[in-house]
Regions:
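N-terminal hydrophobic/helix-forming segments and targeting peptides
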Residues: 1-470
């Protein structure tokens, strides 16, 4: 006979939260689904390191799923599936719902830019018979992490005649790669005494390119630089002046890998925020006939403030929704006012090695599912959207009622630093929004870590958000 529970135990079970079971709550079948889903994610991650490549790969996935390119003057009906590209660096995937847009749209918005090292407009120089690129780092990175690792060159160059050349050098193991040097420890006493942020100066993130002269017998200057340019000219048909109209960057040249003896995690470059972008993309591809129109939007420039005409502060998405509203005979601002959004962005996973940076009761943990961040920002909740209790309640109920692993947390301790997402820019359009994403270890490093089950829970969250009637 089972022992009768005490009054205290019964009350505790009724009104107190229980410790999350995390991955232990999942069946073997569910874990296998997560592992299988992440096979596709790793392909996406490896093929989408920068924005243009992420958009191209997403278009390929969308076309295979029956999506067609958006035509501005075309009439669309329920069930139609379309994509709309903004300057090759942002993309919207849309599934027209049974009710069109008159009752609002459901948005899942992720970003596809990641911290990296960009080239300066005049990057190529030679010093002491070595050729280098001058760089300007992009986003919030720890500069020392980018030295002495293999780097690949990615991006696009527009030549004087207007033709665009896409460049990718260093990803293939049989290709050469590039590197930023560091000072040997034997001579680094002064460097080692500096604060971490100053030990490697941004101006010293010079990328080594070559060491052999074009013609050893020539009296011309800068022959190593000339040799580098000759190689680029032969392969891509570009001249040194073409760097002035180029978008080129250095990113880690290693591919994603399973992490751990149990292969339960994925290490790779750009989890922030491809680990939310891919689940949001797949949710849009998999939803069939939703009640409300669903839009997955992959945006650019989040790591530097979401500025520019491909960032979230651009009016591109707003104007697109206005066009959809016009077709349904309603005002665009009314559509936005009835819309809801999941700002699909990552948060910092608790790291026991650096436990003092976190407040253990209010942070996210690997394998505990998606992390809902009611607000981000810094200090006294500056520079953030703070989701309402009502909207938090709706998202909480959606996750709980569909057995999706989830947790709520902040980005570290109060006054310990801070960060932001695109949520505040969505909120400025009068849209209900909250951040929901995947916990990440070593965020903004060249090699970040996520849990496979958390990635799959993100997919389930976005799909359920799109597919649920209310």
């Amino acid at each position: 006979m089972a022992e009768e529970k005490s009054k205290t135990t019964l009350l505790k079970e009724k009104i107190m939260m229980t410790e999350p079971k995390g991955v232990k709550a999942l069946s073997e079948e569910e874990i296998k689904k997560a592992d299988s889903f992440c096979d596709g994610y790793k392909k996406f991650l490896d093929n989408s390191p920068v924005e243009r490549e992420a958009v191209r790969y997403t278009v390929e996935l969308a076309k295979k799923a029956g999506f067609a390119e958006y035509e501005q003057d075309k009439e669309y009906k329920a069930g139609d599936r379309l994509y709309y590209v903004n300057r090759d660096k942002a993309i919207a995937l849309v599934v027209i719902g049974k009710n069109g847009v008159k009752n609002g749209v459901r948005l899942a918005i992720a970003h596809i830019d990641s911290p990296r090292v960009d080239l300066k407009p005049n990057p190529l120089f030679e010093a002491n018979n070595l050729a280098f690129f001058k760089t300007h780092y992009y986003g919030g990175l720890k500069k020392y992490q980018w030295t002495t690792i293999p780097l690949s060159l990615h991006g696009s160059v527009v030549k004087l005649d207007g033709t665009r050349v896409d460049i990718c050098w260093g990803d293939d193991e049989n290709e050469s790669c590039f590197c930023i040097t560091d000072l040997l420890p034997h001579l680094a006493r002064e460097q080692a005494s500096k604060p971490m942020a100053k030990a490697i100066e941004g101006e010293n993130l010079n990328v080594i390119l070559g060491s052999r002269p074009y013609d050893a017998d020539s009296d011309e200057k800068d022959l190593v630089k000339l040799n580098v340019m000759a190689v680029l000219n032969e392969k891509y048909g570009i001249c040194e002046g073409d760097f002035l109209s180029a978008e080129l960057c250095l990113i880690p040249s290693f591919k994603s890998r399973d992490i751990g003896f149990d292969r339960s995690m994925i290490g790779g470059y750009g989890h922030d925020d491809k680990v939310c972008a891919y689940p949001a993309v797949m949710a849009a591809l998999d939803v069939e006939m939703p009640e409300q129109t669903c839009i997955t939007y992959l945006t650019d420039k989040e790591e530097t403030g979401s500025d520019g005409n491909t960032g979230m502060q651009s009016d591109f998405l707003r104007f697109f929704i206005y066009d959809l509203a016009k077709q349904d005979g309603v005002d665009g601002y009314r559509v936005l006012s009835k819309s809801t959004c999941l700002s699909a962005d990552v948060n910092a996973a608790f790291d026991p090695t650096y436990a003092s940076a976190y407040e253990a009761n209010n942070c996210s943990y690997i394998n505990n599912g998606v992390i809902i961040s009611k607000y981000t920002g810094h200090g006294g909740k500056y520079d953030t959207s703070d989701a309402s209790a009502e909207y938090m309640g709706k998202i909480r109920a959606m996750l709980e009622n569909n057995d999706i692993l989830w947790q709520v947390g902040e980005l570290g301790k109060v006054d310990g630093g801070g960060g932001g997402t695109i949520a505040k820019y969505v909120a400025n359009m009068n849209v209900d929004v909250v951040d929901l994403g995947v916990p990440v270890l070593s965020m903004h490093a060249p090699f970040e870590i996520v849990s496979k089950t958390d990635v799959y829970m993100a997919y389930r969250a976005f799909f359920t958000f799109f597919d649920t009637k209310e």
